[in-house]
Amino acid sequence: MFAVIETGGKQYKVKPGQRLRVESLAGEVGDKIAFDKVLLVAAGEEVSVGAPYVAGGSVQATIANHGRHKKVTIIKFRRRKHSMKRQGHRQNYTEIVIDTINGKTE
């Protein structure tokens, strides 16, 4: 069984027991969260596709960790001017563990 969920403006294919990193979510480590924006639920040969979301579909997960990605360095170089500007950015993320997938399949 797997599902496709939407969170943080991105779509993720998830299975029960899977760990994945998503955009930063509010909550403490160990909190249970539910994703209601389920785009697809599949169990074996049975598939339910939402328009845009599956009615009654939800995915429960547990927050495992909060962290920050590796640093990305941005360089703005001005040719012939002997100048450049450097800037770094680290994006926050939340690591979650998928517990259950709920949703009826056709």
Curated annotation (Swiss-Prot):
Record-linked Pfam families: Ribosomal_L21p
Signal sequence segment: none
Family per record: Belongs to the bacterial ribosomal protein bL21 family.
Subunit comment: Part of the 50S ribosomal subunit. Contacts protein L20.
GO biological process, one term: translation
Organism domain of life: Bacteria
GO MF: rRNA binding; structural constituent of ribosome
PANTHER family per UniProt: 50S RIBOSOMAL PROTEIN L21, LARGE RIBOSOMAL SUBUNIT PROTEIN BL21M
Keyword Ribosomal protein listed: yes
Name assigned to this protein: Large ribosomal subunit protein bL21
GO CC annotation: cytoplasm; ribonucleoprotein complex; ribosome
Source species: Dichelobacter nodosus (strain VCS1703A)
UniProt keyword annotations, A-Z: Ribonucleoprotein, Ribosomal protein, RNA-binding, rRNA-binding
Protein purpose: This protein binds to 23S rRNA in the presence of protein L20.
